[in-house]
Amino acid sequence: MEGLPQMKSTLSISGNTFIALLFSIIVLFPLCANASDKPVVEIAVRKGDTLTGICKKHLTDPHQWREIAHLNRIKNPDFISPSQKLLFPVHLLKGTPIDGTVTFIKGNVTVQEEAGKEWRALLLHNRVKQGSVLRTEEEGTVEITFEDGASFLLKPSTSLKMTTVEKKSSGYFLRELYLRSGKTISNLREATGKGSRFEIQTPSAIAATRGTAFRVSVDDSEATRSEVLNGTIGVEAMNQTVSVNKGEGTFVRKGEPPLEPRKLLPPPAVMNVLPVYKSIPLYFHFEKVADAVSYRVMFAKDSEGKDIIREQAIKPGDSFAIYTAGDGTYFLQARSIDNLGLEGIPAEPAVIRIRMNPMPPLIESPVDNASYTPQSLMFRWLRVNDAVRYHVQIAEDKEFRKIVEAGTDIRDVEYKAAGLDFKTYYFRISSVAKDNYQGDWSDVLRFTIAPPSPVPPDIRK
C-alpha cells in the first residue's frame, strides 16, 4: 500500500473475548508460543480420506501437502486413520474474503478501498472490504463488525488497514490489521466454536495473546503499558517474557525488559450521584484510591463508552466537569492511574440522568428587591412551551422553610397573592411538564410589602 511502511509486527488474538487498546508500538506474545509461531487448526479425518485429497480441499496450494505431512509426522500420505485429527497452518488454508460493516460512527471518518483510489466518507451500515484503509479525524470514531460478532473500534486520529479479512475453509476466521497510528479497541467473540485469529500489526513490534481482554498503550517515548482485564498474556522485550494475569499490568521502557507485573489499582468510586440533575454545569468528585496519581474519567452516551462526550485525566481531589449536555441518560466511568501510568480496573459506569426541561419561567413582575404597598400583589411570567402548568411558592425565608402561600396547579401565566402582611417575602416558580415532571426552580425573587406612607396633614385647613 502506498504511504504505508513494511509491516513488521503482529498482534494475535484467539478466544472468546478480547479487548485491546493499542497505540503504534507494542510487544506482546502468547505464553505458549514464540513470535514466529503460526496458528493452526484441527481438521478431522473421515473414512476414505487421503492426505492429498484433504489438502486439495482445504489448501490454497495443494502441493504443500508435504508440509502438512511433516507437521503431523505422517510417513505414508496414503494411510491416515479416520480417528486422526490433522493440524493445518491457518496461513495455508483457502480463504474467502469477508466484509465488515460499520455499526457505529461519529465525526469524520474516511475510507480508501484500494491504493491510489480517492478517499470517501464512511457512513453507518457501509460495507468495508479487505484491503481498505480507514482513517479517523480528531473527533472521529468508527466501529467495524464482522459476521462472527468480532469487531474493532477506532478511536480519534487513527489510521488502520484491513490487510487480510478471510473465512478459511475450516470455518476459521483470520483477520490481519495494520495499525499505522492511533488507538484501536478490538473485541473477539468465538460464537461458532471454531477457532479464530485476530492480528494487529504495528510499525515495529509484535503482540499476541489467546482468550483474554487487555489494554495496551505506547507513549511518545515508545514505552509500552499493558493491562490485563481477563485471562493471561505474555509480554516480551529484550528476549525476556513475563506472564501478566488478570488484574495485573506491566511497563516496558524502550530497550529494556518488562518490569515484573503489578496489581492494577481499583477504580475510584464517584461520590454523591443524584437521581436526576436539573441544571448544568455538573461537577463530579471521586473517592481517593491509595497509590493513584491521577484518574481517567469518561462521560459517554452509551454504557460501553463508544460515544464519549468528554474524557479527561484529573488529579485526585479535583472535580470532573460537564459544561454541555442535553436531557438524557449518560454513563460516567473512571479508572485509577498509578505512578507508572498503568490504568486500573474499570468500574461499572454510573448512570447519570439529566433533565433540565421544562425550564423555569422568566419572571416579569414583581421586580426583585422592590417594595410594594398593596397587600394583594400580582405575579406574572413568560409562558414555557413544554410546560402544562406552574408551581409557585411564597415564603418568609429564602430557604423556603416558612412557606406562606403556594399554588401547584396554575395554568395561566399569572398568580395573585392576597392578604400579605407588611414584611419581606421570597418568591420562586417552576414549570411542570405533561408527564408531571417538575423542572428546576427559578432564581429566588425578594420583595417587601410596606405600609402606605401616612397622608400628610392639609395645611390649608
Which residues are covered by each model-predicted region?
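Extracellular fibronectin type III
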Residues: 340-354, 434-452
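Extracellular LysM carbohydrate-binding repeats and other cell-envelope/extracellular binding modules
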Residues: 36-37, 57-97
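Short beta-strand segments within Ig-like beta-sandwich modules, predominantly Fibronectin type-III
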Residues: 310-316, 405-411
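Beta-strand-rich modules
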Residues: 325-340, 419-435
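Extracellular low-complexity, O-glycosylation-prone stalks/linkers
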Residues: 294-307, 387-405
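Conserved aromatic anchor
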Residues: 282-291, 377-387
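Primarily a LysM-type cell-wall glycan-binding module
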Residues: 35-59
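Flexible, surface-exposed loop/linker segments and immediately adjacent secondary-structure boundaries
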Residues: 81-85, 90-280, 456-460
